[in-house]
Amino acid sequence: MFTGSIVALVTPMDEKGNVSRSCLKKLIDYHVANGTSAIVSVGTTGESATLSHDEHGDVVMMTLELADGRIPVIAGTGANATAEAISLTQRFNDSGIVGCLTVTPYYNRPTQEGLFQHFKAIAEHTDLPQILYNVPSRTGCDMLPETVGRLAEIKNIIAIKEATGNLTRVHQIKELVSDDFILLSGDDASALDFMQLGGHGVISVTANVAAREMADMCKLAAEGQFAEARAINQRLMPLHNKLFVEPNPIPVKWACKALGLVATDTLRLPMTPITDHGRDIVKAALQHAGLL
């Protein structure tokens, strides 16, 4: 469940900005039908920053309910205050959630020792498997391989989503962790190379609109069929890149709407709808991938 193509799911909203239960069900059904390994609910792509704490928990639990055991659900529970991250994570103890994705603290930029103590404290307050999340381009904080190696010794810290796009990190981390520690790419454009170097899968934005393609690519990579996997990846490469032509999740929400997966591409401020220029770029990438 923690390998292959794991989707960083968008949070669908109606025109008033309320979470749409019907569209959420449609998205989940789409991923069940198309081979996605698991869903991350309310991560960055799911607009965790603009949901209230109550909404955050409610969306995760709604996702779990609508998934109905058909696909594993991972909860995004990161925060830049350790006590808040613990509280968010503990909400899902004994809920049926299979694990939590916890991002490095953002804005306050802790030291490596601060990062270690932060994730250690979360792990001590839950039995849920924990996936570390390193995305310095968003957080301003880079968790180094040595810190990952220390954290990997804690029993319920079982994986990392490594989103630097720096492929040398695969080698560096693998040298410091046990063979059963899971390495997940957080960068769609380099995910196949990441897997070829020993990674186990990807937590994907692209999978929101190309679920079958991403699932097939990851399956082929796991089987060592990299030529076949690369053929899929080449079709998707413009999409991997152009889904970030404007800040995530602006482009991917519009793409979901363009494919009829959601009714609107509504976001909450300070996120604003995609520009005409951005829309044209994403549309061309969808067409290149054979999705539109």
From Swiss-Prot:
Gene Ontology molecular function: 4-hydroxy-tetrahydrodipicolinate synthase activity
Amino-acid biosynthesis found in the keyword field: yes
Pfam family of the protein (one): DHDPS
Catalysed reaction, written as an equation: L-aspartate 4-semialdehyde + pyruvate = (2S,4S)-4-hydroxy-2,3,4,5-tetrahydrodipicolinate + H2O + H(+)
Cited SMART domains: DHDPS (SM01130)
InterPro entries in the cross-refs: Aldolase_TIM, DapA, DapA-like, Schiff_base-form_aldolases_AS, Schiff_base-form_aldolases_CS
Family named by the database record: Belongs to the DapA family.
Quaternary state and interactors: Homotetramer; dimer of dimers.
Protein name according to UniProt: 4-hydroxy-tetrahydrodipicolinate synthase
Organism taxonomic ancestry: Bacteria, Pseudomonadati, Pseudomonadota, Gammaproteobacteria, Enterobacterales
